[in-house]
Amino acid sequence: MTQHDDQPAPMTFTAAPALSGGITVPGDKSISHRSLMLSALAVGASRVEGLLEGEDVLATAAAMRAMGAEVRRDAEGVWHIHGVGVGGLLQPRTALDMGNSGTSTRLLMGLLASHDLTATFVGDASLSKRPMARVTEPLSQMGASFSASPGDRLPLTMKGACPAVPLDYRLPVASAQVKSAILLAGLNTPGITRIVEPIATRDHSERMLKGFGADLAVEVEGDGTRIITLAGEAELRPQQIVVPGDPSSAAFPVVAALLVPGSKVTIANVGLNATRAGLIDLLREMGGAIEVVNPREVGGEPVGDLVVTASALTGVTPDPVRAPSMIDEYPVAFVAAALAEGRSVFRGLEELRVKESDRIATMAQGLRAIGVQVEELEDGIIIEGSGGAPLAGGGPIATRLDHRIAMSFAVAGLVSKNGV
């Protein structure tokens, strides 16, 4: 990978022999964020094992400490959170530094929207380019007020409303972050908060809120629309949580094992929530041999071990409605498509343009640089596969400080002639 901005030394990934053995992946990021937030709002002590200790989740931990919760990690890596109760958050004394975490920022805005306090959110250069309007708009309807930088970006100062106004809101775009922000605001809001979700997104917030004791119900209509209702002024109970492996992190070894000839890899303890299973479903449709063994349920979340065997893949044109179930995994799915037989067409991916980087443009540019024939679309990409032949490689890749871009091209390097 070539150096970009303040990245350290570039790295090169070269063709690999057959991959074999077993691995585990870090804890699920979505569940890790929510474990800290909901534990901080519970009355009493919660315990979390397997928390993802990346910078994004640690930013959430620091924010909860700044607002009065006791959050600590013991010598065995178990996290202990003593909550302050719903409505008990304290005014932070300094700005809340979110680093590069859009999830922390948007969910915490929701959490604070129904508390009588003022908070300023700051972030790194990448996060400060990402728009926040899709969250601030519904939270403003609940009574919160926002003073943001131009383009509804960070730095941003918000003042919560107490009492907040319960909201009846239809999501204009599929977004688990917007849905979760509204639900978190609803926890300390009198009355019923209601969300209409035309296209299902990841449902960790709903599962975990119910697990912590919130009065939450989900009704699914005939066309798949989900109606979510939450009774406010909840009292959350402390929990013992075991965080499953992150399916988004598992995506990279899964695709690598499918593409590198002769490979067979077992990935243990992967979260298999149906709202996150889009990539596994897609790869199976392309011909990928992916078997789930030892299926089980841990803390209300389905978990299993994945056995992945190298496979010849064929091109695919997935229905755009499936995008929310694998929105973070599209970059590595593009790499799989680059090695498949035939054409793949991915549409309905406008959301990728406002991630840590413009992931459509960055992936298209990078794939061209290593010899892949691609056509960039406004809402997606068309990829002509190599039919299993190694990619040319050799071209420099600008990752735009985006970890999913870097990891995706690391996988591409394993099946290239000249490295990436």
Role assignments for model-derived ranges:
Residues M1-V420:
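Structural preference for solvent-exposed beta-strand-turn elements
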